[in-house]
């Protein structure tokens, strides 16, 4: 009998903390759909990896929650409060810098094919969101996150949504 400690289902990955990219991607699709977001997925040729795409303000972006999980290897354990954003709302070209596959297929939540050239907005490539490894919270006017490690001389940062100016507070 062959056994793998890894889960490929959305609920299995969440409950067992052993999800692979398929688990992350399908869980994200279900959550995003419940939130009313238009969502889909990207898949490498041969199915070696799968990640999400999401439509924001009429434009498609890549989100790879598997590669942004700092504990994606279940044998390494988890680091509470640490989460990456390197692959959050990035363009197809930005994704290709790290996801080096010859052919990528994109599909929306109804499995309709999407052309990679339709995932070309660079609006969020290289923005402050992708530089920090803490949860990012928001209210009506501001974003909040920790620069550095929370409780380890990290600073709480408040960023205005309108001006993107930052204000720093000692934690």
What are these language model-derived features?
Residues 15-23:
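Soluble non-cytosolic domains of exported or imported proteins
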Residues 59-156, 164-166:
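His-Asp-centered catalytic microenvironments across diverse enzyme cores
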Residues 1-13:
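Secondary-structure boundary elements
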Residues 11, 47-49, 153-154:
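Short, surface-exposed coil-to-beta transition loops
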